[in-house]
Amino acid sequence: MCRDFIASGYKYLESFEKDYIPIFTYKVNNITIKKLICMQYGKNTVCVLYKIDNPGKQAKFTITPIINFRDFHTMTTNWEFSLKQNIKNKKVKIEINDKPETPIYMCISAGNYIEHYNDVFRNMYYI
């Protein structure tokens, strides 16, 4: 069974911890997903690690990174930007609005990165 959890993932949040780093624990059916987030001090770097405990059948785990530019006081409306995606093995480089001096890098330990184009969230809000 595959559902669109992108906009409703918060409904599956079971717990939140913040000792040294934030840990979000989600429960979907019988699958437990822990998301650990760590930022490197003084750098524009973040690491997101997922730990999945699935004692049942095989499942598909899809991560959809959201790239968003907004003032932290406002809601994203209909602003669009261009993305250039470069994929080599398990490393992804994304350039936004043709600015190679500020790329986003992602490293994937398992699975595959799938390029997406024209995926836009309209009127995004945060709960």
How would you label these PLM feature ranges?
Residues 1-127:
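Acidic, mature catalytic/reactive cores of soluble proteins
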